[in-house]
Amino acid sequence: MSSTLYTSPRLDGFRMPAEHEPQEQVWMAWPTREDNWREKGKHAQAEFVAVATAIAQSTKVTFIVDAKHYEQARLALPDQIRVIEIPSDDCWMRDIGATYVVNDQGERRANSWQFNAWGGELDGLYDSWEQDNAVAEKMAAVTGDYVYHAPLILEGGSIHVDGEGTLYTTEECLLHPSRNPHLSKEDIEDLLKVYLNVEKIIWLKDGLYNDETNGHVDNIMHVIRPGVVALTDCEDSNDPQYAISKAAIKVLSQAIDAKGRTLEIIKLPMPGPLFVSEDEAKNLLKSDSMNRQVGERLAASYANFLITNNSIVFPTFGEKTDEQAKEILQKAFPEHKVIGVYARNILLGGGNIHCITQQVPEKCSIKVV
């Protein structure tokens, strides 16, 4: 299917549903890039399998993988997880996959954004991203949905929506000169409103400290439900994350969402800080743009979790804050099963569980009134 549409979601009455709305499936991609995943990806692959297995308790999972690694992925993954052959340059499905929109008549369509590996020639993380840029349309073809081609360089991890007209993002990412330098903030807001059918955009200044995506919002905060957000907090005034988190809290505490609500802010602890060890910097192909260094600060965050039907899948790091984060998430989602998955090796690649997943909503999404 995957026929191109020349209108827009707003014009056609489609909106991006929130992550807490019903999902048909979750898509992931197999990690094999040897300049990003040490020892040919074997450590990360084990954690991707664990994440997928956790998700599969409540939601169907589809993996994409190139032809060379198809058998490897198929053998490693449980039988109930679908594996299909679609190549990509790396495995960040949140950023390269389709962003789906739905209407109240049970129809679904897909947005394909432009992708430039988090910065293109200015500060992108790799030199060739043509395969990544083709994933969204191929994904929509498999799910059987028409496609809007949005004229905006945008990664899925740079936005969160509440499903009721509010979008959250960061100035650090969306206004970065490596994304859409020809567009003003107002231009970008207009395009987000047209292609996601949102009414109000709440801008945080920065994302998590040392986040190589230029500060994706999904690594510092998450939408729990309309009017309620979770945010990574920092209590160490000597940590560079401290000022970032306090500034974000100030913005969110003063914000009014699209429905006129003030926001409840649930604070998540910050793990660590965590750093790349000597062993973790070894056994990587050399790369100018993704040169992992011993002692490099890792952008670890419990906010980088996935809501999927009746489960919450969140990253753990072997830190004392893991259990505290689980308790906070369980209180925030009392009717969900909260599943922690050890994800340090995913973190070493530059993201975490939310970054490596992309949900496909049910066609019969909840009607917003």
From Swiss-Prot:
Q: What is this protein called?
A: Putative agmatine deiminase
Q: What is its EC number?
A: 3.5.3.12
* Top EC category: hydrolase
Q: Name one Pfam family in it.
A: PAD_porph
Select a single GO molecular function from the record's annotations and give it.
protein-arginine deiminase activity
Q: Which InterPro entries match?
A: Agmatine_deiminase (IPR017754), Peptidyl-Arg-deiminase_porph (IPR007466)
Q: Which residues form a coiled coil?
A: none
| Family the UniProt entry places it in | Belongs to the agmatine deiminase family.
Q: Could you tell me the superkingdom of the organism this chain comes from?
A: Bacteria
PANTHER family, per database record:
AGMATINE DEIMINASE-RELATED (PTHR31377:SF0)
Active site residues according to the UniProt entry:
355 (amidino-cysteine intermediate)
Q: Which UniProt keywords apply?
A: Hydrolase
What processes does the entry annotate via GO biological process terms? Answer: putrescine biosynthetic process
Gene designation per UniProt: aguA
**What's the catalysed reaction?**
agmatine + H2O = N-carbamoylputrescine + NH4(+)
Q: Does the keyword Cell membrane apply?
A: no
